[in-house]
Amino acid sequence: MVNYGKYIKINRYLQKKSISELCDGICTPSTLSKIENNKSNINPKIINQILERLSNINIDILEANTNRLKPLTELFIQRLMLNLDRSDLMAKIEEEQYNYLHSEYILFLYITKLFSNFDLYHINNKDIDEETIDLISEVIEFGDFNELYFYNLLKIIRYKNTNNRLRDFKKIIDGDRYGWLNYFYCDTLFHNGNINEAYMGTKKCYELACENCNINLMYGCILLLGLCSLELSNSNESVKYFKKLENLAPFMKYDINFVINYNLGATMLEKKNIEKAKYYLEALEANKYNYSLSSFFVVHKLGYLYTELKEYEKANYYINWINEFASKQDSKISNLLKKISDSLTIKLKEPNYLCNKKYQEDIEFIFQNSQSIFSHGFQKFYLADLEEVYLIQRRYKELYYIYKNR
């Protein structure tokens, strides 16, 4: 919903109009103050008269502009927060600047100009309009932006001394690097079964993420804390963390239920807790998955699940999806995908699959190559399968070194 009172107040400040000047002949000064402070039971006709005098606009146009411009503004904010190029969006925003001043995103033009060339790693010592910064600081909550992130940016931009800016950003960047290293360490502890240690380490990592306003790291830590809480049979604690995920989800643009079901399901599947994995993963079946890498990770878990459950029709459907996806990739990725689908097919069809030489070779190949092509997490998913293969092959020494290196 458009915040009319805030819109009127900001425009009045920008146009340097007094309350008495703006409300003359329309309403009393106290009524205008109530409008600006969003008091209820104000006649919409009075609000429209104020808007028309202020900006030659009415409520309907204000709402229409808000809805029309929202996707562009959100995309700019996303790129800014990921430190990506925004020049093409800035050009569109410049074209629309008149309309930005007539929408819920009245401040957006100022934000984009202030941060149009802002680079976290190359900070220019340029003069910033203090009045603009004050205005943004006062009403940053007006837009659908991440307040904590912009609060930190504004705080550092205010520094007159460039060295201070660089020092603080280097501190944040170093903190981010340290934070991510600790996060991955805690994630490994979790998958190795050291749940208490993973939980305590992730809590410290989360505190660092909050200090540095690293939204992505905050998100990962909260999810891991929720998983740890479930493993520790603390359901109340896990609910608290998943509720925090909901608070971050709108910015991250993730479907929170999808994220939770996928991560819990994949974790249970990796731990070979098949019934719990099914409880979470089967909720993802209703989605349609296009042939993309992000879809592959979900389809792979579903295919793996139904292979374990020996549900042939569903397992074959997802195995065929992987084969079709593989045909669209370059040889390096395609080869790995083919090994994955072949291993699932053998596991599905042969009761004594562990003794199948091709299955053994495929699993070893997947484990050895999946980290460089996909991720460390994907490699870890296949550790239990590799362990089964090495045990049946009596390759105890190699298995020992894998655990030692981890």
Give the location of each predicted region.
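A short, Lys/Arg-rich alpha-helix, primarily the initiator
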Residues: 1-14
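Alpha-helical residues within helix-turn-helix
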Residues: 10, 20-21, 45, 49
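Residue-level detection of the helix-turn-helix DNA-binding "recognition helix"
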Residues: 13, 27, 37-38, 52
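Helix-turn-helix/homeodomain-like alpha-helical modules used for DNA recognition
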Residues: 69-120, 294-298
